[in-house]
C-alpha cells in the first residue's frame, strides 16, 4: 500500500518467517499504487555496505526498485531576480512523485550554487516524504551539502573512488555510458551502483552528443541475461517519451530517464503516470 504522503509501505500480508528474515528494503512494496516485487538486483543492493540495514542499503534497494527517473533544470522556476520560486518547484516535484516518478535529479549548470542548494532544500525532504530519491549531478560538494540520495557523473567527471572519498559509502552513485566498452566497465566497476545508456535519440538537453540508438540498451539487456550475477540497475536515456517507450522496452530496458516528457508536460503528474504505466512493476 501507499501510506500518507505517498510513502512506500510493504504490500500485502507477510508470513512471520518472511518478515523475520527480510529487511524492509527487500520486501514487496507499492509505489504510486503499483507493486514492486523484490528482484535479484534489489536483493543484492540491499546488502552492499551495511548488512542490509543502513541508509546506503535502503537507498540502493529503492534505486533497484525504481523505473522512472526524471532530470530537470531550474530555469522555469527562476524569478526575474534569479532566485528560485520554491513553491513552484515544490509543486512540480510533488506532481511528478504522485505520478510515479522514483528519482528526480536537478541538473542545471547555468545557476548559482545558492539556487541549487535552495532547490535541494525543497527536493530532498519531498522525495523522502514520497518514498522516492533525490539526485544531484556533477558537483560532489553540492551533493554533500544538500544530503542527496543519489549522485550522478559523466565519463569525464570524478571517478567512483573520488566520489566515495567525498561522499562516503551511503550515497548511490551512477554514471552515463555512451559506448559498449563503457557499459561493460560500468557493470564491473566496484562501488558504482547504476548506469545510464544513451542518448538513445538526439536530444536538445545534450547538444552535440550523438545519438547511439537502441544498441546500448540492447547490449546491457543481453549482458544481464548472459551474466545475471553481474547485473546492476541501468536506465535508457535520451529522447525517451511515451511514443518511443515501446521501442525502448522492446530493446530490453526496464528503467528510463526522461527530461522533456515530464518537465515540459502541461500536466507533469499525468505525463509521469502515462510513462509509468508502460514500465514493468
Report the location of each language-model feature.
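Substrate-recognition "cap/lid" segment bordering the active-site pocket of phosphatases
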Residues: 206-222
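Intrinsically disordered, low-complexity polyampholyte segments enriched for Lys and acidic residues
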Residues: 6, 25-26, 49-50
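Glycine-rich anion-binding loop/nest that anchors nucleotide
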Residues: 196, 234-240, 257
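Compositionally biased, low-complexity flexible segments
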Residues: 3-23
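Glycine-rich phosphate-binding active-site loops on the catalytic face of alpha/beta enzymes
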Residues: 155-162, 196-208, 245-275
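Position-driven detector of the extreme protein N-terminus
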Residues: 2-3, 25, 36, 44
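Conserved N-terminal beta1-alpha1 strand-loop-helix module at the mouth
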Residues: 30-150, 166-192, 219, 230-234, ...
